[in-house]
Amino acid sequence: MTVFSGVNKIEFEGTFEGIGKDVVMSQMIRALQKHFPSIRDKNYEFSLFLHIFQRYVLENTSITHDLVCDKIRLPIIDEVVELDDIKNYGLLEGKLLSKLAILKLTGKANPIIGKESPLFEVKNGMSSLDVIVRQTQNLNVRYNSDVPLIFMTSLETESQVSNFLEEHYSSSKVRWKTVVQSSFPQIDKDRLLPIDLQINSHENDFWYPCGTGNLTDTLYFSGELDKLIAQGKEILFVSNVDNLGATGDLNILNFIINEKIEYLVEVVERTANVSNTGVLATYKGKLRSVYYNCLSNESASTCRIVNTNNIWIDLKKLKVLIESNSLNLPIHSSESKITHKNEEIECLQFKTQLVDCIAFFPNSRVLKVSRDRFLPLRTCKDLFLLKSTLYDLDSNGTFNLYPLKFGLLPSIDLGDEFATYETFKIGVPDIPNILELEHLTVMGNVFFGRNITLKGTVIIICDENDVITVPDGSILENVTIWHKSQLEDMNGY
């Protein structure tokens, strides 16, 4: 990519909200050079940001929530391959793993759990990082392989992740490393200029990781892509660090290699516990990711599968696309507010998503996988399920699901009082036994005791001026509770 040195490099037409587009670009370039001189030490980041900003100015690229719902088309179900159909696809050989590398997207702390999210205890004393390293280690030991593990971090997470891994897994059977993705400056929405801070401050409020789509450029410009190819790696398996079911799978790898697939995205059946996650759809003739709440009412009612962000990529094909400047991913722009020098500033952020790369790989596939490959830890209801008796976590980092009485995971609906982990652990200090639970709704000031069992459908809704405490040892089955007196009157709980 070209590092823009002046406005004469760009052709402009029309205006951008009353300001000449050439003026907007020229001002941005001068502001970056003046206020952030050290950005020139990373020419590729300078270029990446200007490339994205230029497209935003010239195209006024659609913001995600401004997509025209009626133009979104869900994929035909026949176009989706089922995991069961590819199991034992040809002869499974452990030596295929010599062609595989695994990468975990670790650029953003979980807003529900907080800055400690990668180190947060999920179950049995293990954090997300413990689980992931042990899963990869188990794969290597089982097949006598050497699958490397890469964590793509950010300015926000790099020191935390690398320090933890160095302390606990410096001598493990997994070759791990971290690669820091690019960060972009927050843009003042009104002035269309970066907030005036020195780049060396790296305050997280003013710098942000620029989305999972940046993985391609980070791998390329860091030299990691060439290193992987030189090591004989052909396929990169990418997933979110908070998806604890995303493991290297020999069946999927075998299918990809035999079919010469260049890009594969895993999807799962949508359930009641999945809210506004990504959905693969066609928009203006191109396959891309949209959020579930962008769908029309008609499409939403027929949407059966959602994106897991488990992605398999052919590394050599990726390099070809990068070097031919072919990956012009859709820009997802969003607005936020930050406080700087006691002044509230409305900001713009520009991100790209890795899943949108699917439109640029000629031989791509969508694979519907089983639910055990999508165990996200994004919300407190996810935490409620994973920490419950429904799941067992073994020493290899594998989650095992107990047989479900109703055939599906229970539907969990928690109110705003349980929105963050800090408030969640106060209201639910001990996860109830939910082996026979079908649905749970909890709203208001509700506090659970210990050794509680929930069965069937349990609804607890507390008035805003009241408090409901579920006593230790309670057994609640097919009940709706509106007032604490109902618990006091119950027999046998």
From Swiss-Prot:
Domain of life: Eukaryota
Keyword Cell membrane: no
Entry GO terms, CC: cytoplasm
Keywords, alphabetical: Nucleotidyltransferase, Transferase
Binding locations of substrate: 107-108, 240-242
Known catalytic reactions: alpha-D-glucose 1-phosphate + UTP + H(+) = UDP-alpha-D-glucose + diphosphate
Keyword Nucleotidyltransferase (UniProt): yes
Enzyme Commission number(s): 2.7.7.9
Record-linked InterPro entries: Nucleotide-diphossugar_trans, UDPGP_fam, UDPGP_trans
Residues holding UTP: 105-108, 181, 211, 242
GO biological process: glycogen metabolic process; UDP-alpha-D-glucose metabolic process
Gene Ontology molecular-function annotations: UTP:glucose-1-phosphate uridylyltransferase activity
Enzyme class: transferase
Functional note: Plays a central role as a glucosyl donor in cellular metabolic pathways.
Family of the protein in this entry: Belongs to the UDPGP type 1 family.
Name of the featured protein: Probable UTP--glucose-1-phosphate uridylyltransferase
